[in-house]
Design a protein with these regions (language model features):
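Mobile acidic interaction elements
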Residues: 18, 22-23, 33, 46, ...
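Short Fe-S-cluster ligation motifs
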Residues: 45-65
């Protein structure tokens, strides 16, 4: 059975992103659960760069793909020095990130 884009994205995420990020815990980078639809720099418990915190970017599939293509071009002065060179990998990682929904409030 062929893998879905999100399944491929999980594999790419684990290989290229998980040394700094995870779905639920901050590391060198912020946690990703609920990132699609969230404002950049919005997690209160993560120390973002001033450029990212003040960017007013909304993380959509399109802005996340632009970010993964070249973070510095999207938000000059941000702190992430990594990008995904393969467009398919970017598409798949964004598909995976979109599966990481925020838990519903009780």
């Amino acid at each position: 059975m062929a893998q879905t884009s999100a399944e491929r994205g999980l594999a790419v995420y684990e290989a290229h992103c998980s040394s700094c990020h995870s779905p639920d815990a901050n590391g060198d980078g912020p946690a990703h659960r609920g990132v699609v639809g969230r404002r950049a720099g919005a997690l209160k418990d993560f120390d973002y760069s001033p450029a990212l915190r003040n960017s007013k970017i909304l993380w959509t599939r399109a802005t996340l793909k632009a970010w993964l293509t070249n973070p510095e071009a999207l938000i000059p002065g941000q702190g992430m020095d990594y990008q995904l060179d393969d467009a398919g990998d970017r598409e798949d990682v964004v598909a995976y990130l979109a599966t990481l929904k925020r838990p519903r409030a009780r």
